[in-house]
């Protein structure tokens, strides 16, 4: 009787463990530069300026079977802005705009993840809500995110990748130089690849 009880407990424990898939922890691949944040903003309503932030890092936890439990944190160095024009980059990082000398980092921390199904390519999608801190001000934003895939890499690691889009009003994040209402909206695109922590 004791042997049967122990066997039943062992089987039950194995089944329970199999059902409790733990989200894996990942570090965003900064070293390999497999992460970036791009932006697009109207210039006075006459054209568009596009650019990117070249220095960012972060971490996330994710399990494709339970995407609603995912968590992410991304940190961006504001001084790393690049718009292919040195004088403009200098102006963007000045006190007129990002004030990178005072506010060196912009930060996004997720607060919830709401799965929204799959896109036309069959990729998982979700609304990732979180707090964005920029220019010393924290505001809630929602990122439309897509899980691009996961798997082993050639170097013995395991990777997972995502992309996402959102839009913000830059005037919501403290007083910046006024360029008119057409230049307040900023479209953001983020793509990153994480390496599973060992």
UniProtKB/Swiss-Prot annotation:
Any Pfam family hit: YceI
Family annotation (InterPro entries): Lipid/polyisoprenoid-bd_YceI, TTHA0802/YceI-like_sf, UPF0312/YceI
Keywords, sorted A to Z: Periplasm, Signal
The keyword Zinc is annotated on this UniProt entry: no
Compartment list: Periplasm
Cleavable signal peptide: 1-23
Superkingdom to which the source organism belongs: Bacteria
Record's GO cellular component terms: periplasmic space
Family: Belongs to the UPF0312 family. Type 1 subfamily.
Name this polypeptide is given: UPF0312 protein PFL_5802
Origin species: Pseudomonas fluorescens (strain ATCC BAA-477 / NRRL B-23932 / Pf-5)
């Amino acid at each position: 009787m004791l042997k049967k009880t122990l066997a039943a407990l062992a089987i039950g424990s194995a089944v329970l463990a199999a059902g409790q898939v733990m989200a894996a922890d990942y570090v965003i691949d900064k070293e390999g530069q497999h992460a970036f944040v791009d932006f697009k903003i109207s210039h006075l309503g006459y054209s568009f300026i596009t650019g990117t932030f070249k220095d960012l890092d972060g971490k996330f936890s994710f399990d494709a079977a339970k995407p609603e439990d995912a968590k992410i944190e991304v940190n961006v160095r504001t001084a790393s802005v690049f718009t292919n024009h040195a004088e403009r980059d200098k102006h963007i990082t000045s006190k007129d705009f990002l004030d990178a000398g005072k506010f060196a980092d912009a930060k996004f921390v997720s607060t919830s993840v709401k799965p929204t199904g799959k896109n036309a390519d069959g990729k998982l999608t979700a609304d990732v809500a979180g707090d964005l801190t920029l220019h010393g001000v924290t505001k809630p934003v929602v990122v439309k995110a897509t899980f691009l895939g996961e798997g082993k890499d050639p170097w013995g690691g395991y990777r997972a990748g995502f992309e996402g889009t959102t839009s913000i009003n830059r005037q919501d994040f403290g007083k910046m130089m006024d360029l008119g209402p057409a230049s307040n909206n900023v479209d953001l695109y983020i793509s990153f690849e994480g390496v599973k922590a060992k």
